[in-house]
């Protein structure tokens, strides 16, 4: 059975039940297709990208980070990666995805961006 890593990026502002439903639906889909869902990586976007879409938003990255941790902490195979939220570690989504994909593919997993 081939391992698969699922990748979700987005604002998650705010995170809600349909985000979780989407994750579970994708996990179920790939499990049904015969894959072992090794992990699901959730990556909230940098706040700057949200400011382009919405006007008048307050910067609430700490609040959003707490929401994600509280909402997803019970699920062992869901990993939250905050690197794109943080200006110091933000290398850009395209490079971030490419680096993750190279890492998991080189270790024998299939990497799927949802």
Regions found by a protein language model. Give the residues of each.
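Nucleotidyltransferase catalytic core that binds NTPs
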Residues: 1-114
